[in-house]
Amino acid sequence: MTGGPPYNSQSPTQQPRYPVYSPPSKTRPYYPNNDQYQQHPPQTPPAFPPQPPLARSPHYSHAPSPLPATLPPLNGGAPPSHHQESSSQYQAHQSSGTPQFPLPRPYSASVLSSNGASPYNHPTPSHAHPSSGRLDSLSQSPPKKDQESLYPIGGNVASGFSSSIMLSPPCILSDSIQKPARAADPMSFASILSGPTEERPLPRKQSPLPEPAPVQTPAPAPPVLAPVPAARKATPPPPTAPVPVPAPLPEIKEPEPLPTPLPRLEKKPSAEKRRRNVDQESRASESLPVPPTNGVSEPAKVSRASNVRKTMSERDTEAINKIIAEIDNAEKSDVESPGFEAEYERYIAKGKKRALDAEKAESIRRKRRRHDFLVKLGKTFEKQANAGMDRFRVANEASVIAEVQAKEIQDEKERKKDMQRKRRRENTVRLEMQKKIEAERKANKANDAAEKAKFLREAERAQRKIKSTKRALEGVTSPEEIGEVTPLAPNLEGGTTSSFHIGRSSPSRRKSGRSGGSSRPKKSKEQKQAEKDAAEAAYAAMENDEPLPLAPKEDPRKESLKKEAKGARSKEPTPQPLSAFESKGYNQIYEQIWRDIARKDIPKVYRIKALSLSTRQENLRKTAQLASKQSRKWQERTNKSMKDTQARAKRTMREMMSFWKRNEREERDLRRLAEKQEIESAKKAEAEREANRQRRKLNFLISQTELYSHFIGRKIKGAEADASGDAAVDGSDETVRPGKAGDHTIDLPSSVADLSTKVTNFEDLDFDAEDETALRQAAMANAQNAVKEAQDRARAFNAEENPMAALDEGELNFQNPTSLGDIEISQPNMLTAKLKEYQLKGLNWLVNLYEQGINGILADEMGLGKTIQSISVMAYLAEVHNIWGPFLVIAPASTLHNWQQEITKFVPDIKVLPYWGSAKDRKVLRKFWDRKHITYTKESEFHVLVTSYQLVVLDSQYFQKVKWQYMILDEAQAIKSSQSSRWKNLLGFSCRNRLLLTGTPIQNNMQELWALLHFIMPTLFDSHDEFSEWFSKDIESHAQSNTKLNEDQLRRLHMILKPFMLRRVKKHVQQELGDKVEKDVFCDLTYRQRAYYTNLRNRVSIMDLIEKAAVGDEADSTTLMNLVMQFRKVCNHPDLFERAETKSPFSLAHFAETASFVREGQNVDVRYSTRNLIEYDLPRLLFSSSGRLDVAGPDNEKVGFQNKYLQHLMNIFTPENIKRSVEDDGAFSFLRFADTSINEAYEQSHLGVFERAVRRRGQSDRLSQLGVIYDNEGDQTANSVLPHSLFNIVERNDRQAVYDVAPEGYMRDLMTVSESSFERQGLNVIEPCASPAASAPPIFISCSGQTALRETNDTFFSVPVRHALYSTPSRQLEEQILEKKLDPAPFSLPPMLPKPLSAKGRYTHIEVPSMRRFVTDSGKLAKLDELLRELKAGGHRVLLYFQMTRMIDLMEEYLTYRNYKYCRLDGSTKLEDRRDTVADFQQRPDIFVFLLSTRAGGLGINLTAADTVIFYDSDWNPTIDSQAMDRAHRLGQTRQVTVYRLITRGTIEERIRKRALQKEEVQRVVISGGAAGGVDFNTRNRESRTKDIAMWLADDEQAELIEQKEKEALDRGEVFGAGKGGKKAALKRKKDLTLDDMYHEGEGNFDDISAKPSGAATPVSTADNIATPSSTPVPKRGRGRGTVKGSSKRAKTTTERLRLIDGDGGL
């Protein structure tokens, strides 16, 4: 229970005595009552009244509790009301519920004072014992002095007046104990002036007293007049008669009876008013309390021990009594008589003033006493708290630490469990999401409603599971009960609380179910709203520091009990209140009992009751179930015959149902079969009609195109059309009559077409009619109209802006080309080159096309000079017809420089404007454009503008404003897609004629050729679906199925293409050109490649790929192509997946570091810079003379003594001693015969073994040579022994060993058997296989002294030692040899270290990947290594083409390893670098290999210096490879060109090559007109292209098995691989992507951009790139990226891939 202290209406609203409660620290101990420090302690209800004898015992004293009560009243009832009392007998208690001290209960009762002041401005409360109700003082026990100081702590020792008068109800006393009414109010004026009743009152002096009426009064008690305290309001005596203070009488006499007062005096309002005032004043007064007397307070008589009463004389007493009697007998009292109002008011004012003064003084004293008391109490509490805290810490610190550690361990376990649960739930969400998506997909594909509903239910279940799992994952649980956590929460039900509960309520222990315990009664809406409003009001009051509005707890039962008790009290006489126990010990025991009951017993009893209730309910439920079963038993008792009858009826019903179902199924099947046959017959008839309609439509389109081609062909070369044998067009005498432009007409025979026939739209033609005459006439009219429109458009090209140009330039102006007539064209004189015969024919064909205003396609094979023919056309127009442009040449980026150079070279008079570069550069170039004049002259700024496809699209708004005379598109396959923005922008340019240059008009399919025809003649070759399908589908299907194409269709196709396309092949027109030989070189997979390939194929399910391909999802197609790319990487080189890394042991060393090499100087000495992490620190003492046994010094006298005497004084090898010995023929006299001087002998004694060996190595062998000088002719050696070398026997006979004398031959082998055998077996070149797991340099000894550093440097960096061991001269010696130009042989001696055993040994254990293994890891690279070795030896030069740029990077490493010179060109090479790289290869014969990417380096460049072409990996498109190999096999090539194609056997590359051969067959059939045969093609159609790619991943056995299953599925009428989706899923496919789109160079969709280029392939800077959305920035390269999943780069569009193909990344 929570809540603050209950404030009633009489409680003052003042601030608490102590500051607001704040939670104690964790280290603060609890108080002994196990409750934390509370700001508002709990309250205690009044105790039970004790028995009267015990309460009135004079020896019984109660120790009052300084704290308020802590328990609520019993049974949750409202606390009993307390009367506000005017006096107090025990100041430690108070009547209100306000706490006196907001502190916890002390340890013992001896600490507190019994007379502490009240914290509020109220009278000090009295003890809970009510008085006995007697009004005389004789009924009280005499006071005991030892009880006056029961509690020694200072306080207000005065006591107040008893509250028994206020507690006891008024009653009528008998005559023997009755007292006058004024005695009940001791503060009244009459009580003060009253005296003994037996004496007569004094008469009044102011006015005569009336005659008193005889009133019977009882004998009063002896008059004891108490002094009036300052805090009380007293009625002043009459001013004329001052009343002295009477002294107590020694004896008490029997009073005389007085006359009874009149009844009207008791009903006076003034008396009641005075009594009311006196009661209020007494309640407000706190001064002059009466000390307790035997625990019972006196009624109203108090006296001070310090005041001595004065005795009055008998005369004074009689006078006073007489006056009192007169006052009592008077009709009105003296104060009620007129004339006393002012005195009365003055009296009231003085009384209030005295009361205020007394109250203020008492308040000051009370505060001082309270402060002293609280200071002492606080110190006592602090001392006890510190002691308790220390005891608690000592007792529980270890257990708390262990508990905290255990809690942390448990929390860590719980956290891990939570993470596991989280992962399981996340997996559940993912799996359920997949199930949901799968169910929704199946539901969308389901045809049956029931099946669809089932799938939807599965999806709904999965969604619910996902929702519940996500809720559990997010931690959302069911709402729990809101537990109150603040100790100051409002108690809206009133009453007091003993404790508050922090945290959530304990979970209910009731069992869920219908048989659970009884639930709480539901509250109405009004009650809930009332509780909510009350809570809001309470919180608002708490925020505003206002008293909380307490709502009494409503309980109907309690209200009824209160009413019954009230009625009973009204009927029965009110008993006398009994005194309750008020001792402190009693209250503590009482509170402890209730606290234990509330904390322990009540929950226990509640649990017992709840368990009993649940058990009882469970038993009742079971009993009810048994009773229900028993009551239903009679229903189960059925007759056996009835059961048998029902069973027979059910069996009969089932049989009947099965019979009729079978019958209906058979009838339904027959009906469906009949309907199916009818539908198939109708479909067949409709298909025949549609086929005839499509045939007529296609025949119309082909006839119209044929007629158009016939007209154009007869105009250009009339004989060619006659030779074609076209039966549909008869020979005619059509001529072109010279004359005016408007007179040009074409004469056709009347049998062919009616000239008056109007042009008919394609949509208005009736293709359902059987008669085709109208269609032929419409085709003839449309063809004639198309020819006329083309010529009119050519004539009117310049007529709009410059109508006078024809008159100014003469009648041969080319603006009217039809006026020229048939002119024989010769080579222009402006052209500096000599055209070949076929090129001159091409020039004539192009000029005739231009004259007729018709566009064309020059499709000569690559290398036959399409560029020079185009340039000759521009030269012819400029020279003959004075047409100087503007001409627009659009080419790939790699050929832009080639166009510029060839135009400048062959036609110097024509000015070329190269239009490329940055946006700023192009803006400057556009200033040379002349948009105002369409006629360009020789003096114009430029004549030909050369640019790339990207820039044309980028600046299309500027190009569209210029009228171009001629637009030449080089490599026109760049516009093979009619849906691309490039195709549409170029088609919108204003130009008179268009010329397309392409060596491969058909690359992947016939649709590309149709796009080119559509571009040159958009009005004729319109995008009709029928024509497009006839072009692509029919012809391709014939090529794929290896069937012969219809001769009529093939002839008509050639008839259509012949007027618009000119194609010559090298072998037909160029005899001097060398042959081209193609060879397929098959390679095998190495062990590493085979492992990679098998692992990849095992991880892929071919059936799953085929099923996904059947669905036709674009994402699945992309994934499939990525998978194909991975297989191609394996075939190329396994290092494309994972490079062999450099290996080294773990180095436990510290490497040298420097902040800047500037500080290190020119030469950085890194020797011994690698140091061990472990350093052995030695003290400087060990390196000084004091710590060394062999170094003399000031601190080492012993070594100095030894050195002095042993090394010098006693040393026989001193020069002086040796000289003396030699002179005296002593022991050293042998030196003269050993060729040794005195100094040499002395040095030999002081040098070490190594120094002597070094010196011995440097001595010349001069003694052994004397034998040659002294030899005689008879081969007898003369006496060549000199005296000074008499003892040098070894030096004189120094003969070389046989090993040195015979450096080669059999003799050397015999002398060096072990060494030669070791070398022959190759043991000296074996690479070490084992390497340590860790390595470290030797432990370094460090010392901080200079001596140690100098000695270490002398040892490590000794120049003579290094020179002797390694035979490396010093830097200074080398410089002197070079400066003096000396022979270095005498200065370079052989090293003293022996030759190492292994030639492959290393100084370190770092293993660099072997390049030899790098070559052998790939079957292709190993074969290429052999091939390049042969080609290098034969003097050939090689063009090496790749699909992947990363493979080019690996090839650079290989060429560097083999020391082959090379250059590189790929898509990232900048434009200027491409030109320089091509020029270097053409001009420098030392460059052996040219590395190129197939797409970027296979277009337009001339590389005739090479005679060998190697394709490391083939392209999807065979025409790309053809273009690449024609870079070498072209005009200018005099040698035979050999083409090698590396193919890995048994892999996907074989199938790709098979597909490429199929495409080549399509080109041969369409372009060359040959028969389709000789190549074995598969029969897979275009719709299953993605499935074909999936089949490439399988081996031959798997492919055969899959084809067999597919055939079986087709026989059953199903779609193989379509899955559960059925035929609808198979038909619902995305737009088919061609193989060229899906794999654009290895640099397009699958460009491996992980390696940075080298050589000439310099990355393009961002400043040179075009900042447009369509531009493709050069990707950053780095190891290990490639096309790995996770790359953030977006997929390239078709436009970007085409741009990358053209190598335009730098524009």
From Swiss-Prot:
It catalyses: ATP + H2O = ADP + phosphate + H(+). It holds the Pfam family SNF2-rel_dom. CDD domains: DEXQc_INO80, SF2_C_SNF. It is found in: Nucleus. SUPFAM superfamilies: P-loop containing nucleoside triphosphate hydrolases. Residues 593-718 form the DBINO domain. The keyword DNA damage applies. A motif (DEAQ box) lies at residues 970-973. SMART domains: DEXDc, HELICc. PROSITE patterns: DBINO, HELICASE_ATP_BIND_1, HELICASE_CTER. The keyword DNA repair applies. GO terms for molecular function: ATP binding; ATP hydrolysis activity; ATP-dependent chromatin remodeler activity; DNA binding; histone binding. GO terms for biological process: CENP-A containing chromatin assembly; DNA repair; positive regulation of transcription by RNA polymerase II; regulation of TOR signaling; subtelomeric heterochromatin formation; telomere maintenance via recombination; transcription by RNA polymerase II. Residues 395-478, 635-706 form a coiled coil. Residues 1423-1583 form the Helicase C-terminal domain. It comes from the Eukaryota. It is an enzyme of class 3 (hydrolase). Component of the INO80 chromatin-remodeling complex. PANTHER family: CHROMATIN-REMODELING ATPASE INO80 (PTHR45685:SF2), HELICASE SRCAP-RELATED (PTHR45685). The DBINO region is involved in binding to DNA. This is Chromatin-remodeling ATPase INO80.
